[in-house]
Amino acid sequence: MNNKQQTFQFENAFADVFMFENGTEVREYHVMIHANSSRLPYAQQLEAVLGAYNQLIEGELVGAQAVFKRYFLSDAANQADDVIVSDVTDCAKSIIQQAPLDGTKIALWVYLMTNVQTGLSKSGLYEVRHGDFRHLWNGSAHNMAANSEYQTRLLFNEYNMQLIQEECTLEANCIRTWFFVNDVDLNYGGVVRARNQFFFTQGLTVNTHFIASTGIGGRQQDPNVLSQMDNYAIAGIRKEQVHYLYASTHLNRTSDYGVSFERGTQVNYADRRHVFISGTASINNKGEVVYPKDIIKQTHRMWENVEALLAEADCNFNDVAEMVVYLRDTADYELVREMYEERFAGKPYVIVHAPVCRPGWLIEMECMAIKAVDLPTMPKF
């Protein structure tokens, strides 16, 4: 087995860790750190989470460098500034109000690698260098344009200019995006319109390809921010390394119902495969909500859909390194937590409050998988 899962206990926090190791110099870790006492004030919960992170990178994960972090907060207006001041790690950081539903105020997902060089690139994207590749991460991009459509259009324009500075394009190099939409029921339509229009100008169509993505409810500390974008691109990636996942027995193309993202993307290297599964809900291959108003059946159908996408990349849930689970209704948390704990105990995951883009979907999940492969015609990671 190249994958290993462990849980570490700390003072007032715990961490679930997934490690990928295949004998090469780059090990990969996904870590989900949770505060374990909802009674503590926010400052102490933040201190506990950051303390757990620091102990990990000085101990079990020594030598690993953070390449991307996402903070899930219960009240960004009162909490985000403290994160910015307290965490000075040199990596892309995403900070979003999506309350952890275990009753705590903060959770942290961290993606780390060993033997890579990191730093801020000339474009403002965070660069992770190894071999022939530069992995370009960005978190918490936002602006103050008049509405969600204008904000998203400006986000794409700015990101496109950053990619051009890196001698990249959206079509050839961008692998994954996330959009966090303040009041998703009201503002998601504007995000969709802006993305559809911008993709068309960049040659991203139903006849070429789109980009794996999550579009979900979430808010920044400033209520005027209606659309926040996180993104990941790879400078140096070759077209033959990238494959898109469809699972057409279970899901339809998103363009069938007017949106433009891929269900999943796999990226092949000589020694490993990365699989990025987009936000996935209880949908069928006609684009319909399956099992309306039934959280248990929707959860099972969502898992089945994700399994079908993973299988297309010759992966399964054992290869999944992290999961983020989004719930529309906080009242569903205990039931969903029990289901996840029964099936995925020890796997790095977090369940947060974040309405899905269509009201009928009660739950959505996204994940990343890592699998050892032997593909000598592909470039080394």
Which positions does each model-derived feature cover?
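N-terminal presequence-like segments and the immediate start of the first folded domain
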Residues: 1-321, 327-381
